[in-house]
Amino acid sequence: MKVVIAPDSFKESLTAKQVSEAIKSGLSRVWQDAEFVTVPVADGGEGTVQSLIDATEGEQVFVTVKGPIGNDVEAFYGILGDGETAVIEMAEASGLHLVPSEQRDPKNTSSFGTGQLILNALDRGIQRLIIGLGGSATNDGGTGMLAALGVKFLDSDGQPITPNGGGLVELASIDVSGLDARLAGCEVLVACDVDNPLCGEKGASAIFGPQKGATPADVELLDSALSKYGELTEQVTGKHVLTQKGAGAAGGMGAALLGYLPARLKPGIEIVLETVKLAEHVADADIVFTGEGRIDHQTVHGKTPMGVAKVAKEYGLPVIALAGCTGDNFQAVYECGIDAVFVCVPRAMSLPEALEEAEVNLANLAENVARLWQLPR
């Protein structure tokens, strides 16, 4: 019997690897002769780098970079087990969590540090980049990142502007002659789960600006600046970024990646599952386990359990999801490939208790599911 275990993390409690091991521990009490394959995964958001490192036996690389407001921050990215692929989360270097709430202002934040992470990966000979968007503090159109990679953004006097949201107001021309030539030989995959355009009422500034500290006046200013940036980008690169779906992701970082790098945007879960080769693992399996901290009506929208179930169902396999809790209309997952959902909280308990005991409770739940599976049918 071959069992594949491919869960996401239980946020604020267990990493995806810890969840995988807990489920394996419980199942092995009953299925003692089974072959277990653990594949910790993520949906392209928080925890993706660590999950891919764990799944491929890769390594962390720590780098001191410039944070969103210019201070030094210690960030990391992952080099996967193949030694050729780097996984970078934008939030590591340019995340909103790096900016104190009283200093949050997307006119003043820059994605420069994300560019420094990419540069470090190139210096290590990386040929394939996976870049996760989301959680950014920026609305600079990715100009900070591009500046770190050699692009010059100039005002009407030919002087460099500050590559942040506010600096874009002064943008008059773009010089790409210094863009790092090594990027042309790289494969760049961007984990992106939003389809917002760069500008307009559904654009980066209007939709994501307020949560980063933008006032209504700021939104208008930033949107206008991104529009001019988009026009110049199209002139310089010949690529249509103003109306491209996903260009507005992460404060316009999507536009920078699509315009200046050989990038392709894909749903995060698809990139992750392809990278960990989940299909190869489940092709000859008998049952698949997945899960996440909370399963509810949102789970069907590109979350890990749905991605895992989709792959498993291509091979006609049963899929069991284990969760910390369920929410409204969690039954929606039953229409999308998951056959049963089980919750690991064994009694009434506080949230701190549930988080602290999650590993033990999850293992016990997995054991009970295996025992149930053993019953004559």
Which residues make up each language-model segment?
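N-terminal loops that bind phosphate or other acidic moieties
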Residues: 1-133, 137-377
